[in-house]
Amino acid sequence: MSPAEREFDIVLYGATGFSGKLTAEHLAHSGSTARIALAGRSSERLRGVRMMLGPNAADWPLILADASQPLTLEAMAARAQVVLTTVGPYTRYGLPLVAACAKAGTDYADLTGELMFCRNSIDLYHKQAADTGARIILACGFDSIPSDLNVYQLYRRSVEDGTGELCDTDLVLRSFSQRWVSGGSVATYSEAMRTASSDPEARRLVTDPYTLTTDRGAEPELGAQPDFLRRPGRDLAPELAGFWTGGFVQAPFNTRIVRRSNALQEWAYGRRFRYSETMSLGKSMAAPILAAAVTGTVAGTIGLGNKYFDRLPRRLVERVTPKPGTGPSRKTQERGHYTFETYTTTTTGARYRATFAHNVDAYKSTAVLLAQSGLALALDRDRLAELRGVLTPAAAMGDALLARLPGAGVVMGTTRLS
């Protein structure tokens, strides 16, 4: 049976967790005609979520599936055109579902922020997914759609203007309000560091700027591309003169997703495309000191974690950190916001800025981005790229998301600066 003939357009797996509930809410209130089912391990909890969603979801079917029982995942994937999964940490629970979707030719989107899960998915299932026609799309939330789409916007604009390929390209987190960290986020970071610290080869891979490129020799040699940088804003763009920027905790993951997008598109961004991510720390007298402190702390914490985290007992870590399934309150989500700006210079010297902003917190935004990714895969297939395999958001559905996300409250755009 072809994906278009299947019982469901979208199955949301992990619907009873924190991110799963938020994603289900957005799907229920999206006004979409998509045929949607909720999936998870507990029928009782699934019924509770469906009831919470109200009349729009009253007839959504429920599917029992469990990451520890691969046959249930295969059965679920065979019934769906698209599977969205919020079940993490993906290093522990994700590969069986990737395998099921690759086998069935089912499109897939997740919220991973774990490099080794991404690399293992590519190594094990890229070819099979390409052969069956499946799109396995990684990192469809706050990690890494804003990063990926901002660069894609810049690429599209430079093509339209005929101003050449992208060269030095730098993302800056300009504003961010987030008052709580979810248990799922903590589990993701913990699992990523545990994986790197327990395996020297994994640790080597995650420090390579091209972790997610399997043909490493095909990538251009652009010199050192450090993840954590302390720089005055004027070094990035004249518009940032007076500001200081420092290390951004998500840079080691997002940068590699963006570089994979370039490789998947046959280096359409350019062979001299050089990409970094930082966060703005203001322009006060203390900003240079703050930038140094933040950069040192982030780099030191992740560096030490990638070497030694596996020495910490798993139970101890779980006891002192937020529990999976927990997260900020609804009021806190609505009070949050973020704005990313990405600056680039092209081979002809043209300069551009792309913006990606959302007036909710990162968790609410993540749910919106994942849900809209699912709707794009299910309903906007004429806007999707022809690529198949283990993909990135921009490479697989950049045009579809650029068309969809403004209707979901995301503000995007590009400006030519010179």
UniProtKB/Swiss-Prot annotation:
Which residue stretches, if any, does this entry annotate as coiled coil? none
Uppermost EC category:
oxidoreductase
What are this entry's molecular-function GO terms?
oxidoreductase activity
**Which Gene3D superfamilies does this one have?**
NAD(P)-binding Rossmann-like Domain
Question: What InterPro entries does the annotation carry?
Answer: NAD(P)-bd_dom_sf, Saccharopine_DH-like_oxidrdct, Sacchrp_dh_NADP-bd
What's the EC number here? 1.3.1.-
Concerning PANTHER family, the annotation shows: SACCHAROPINE DEHYDROGENASE-LIKE OXIDOREDUCTASE (PTHR12286:SF5)
In Swiss-Prot or TrEMBL terms, this protein is called Trans-acting enoyl reductase
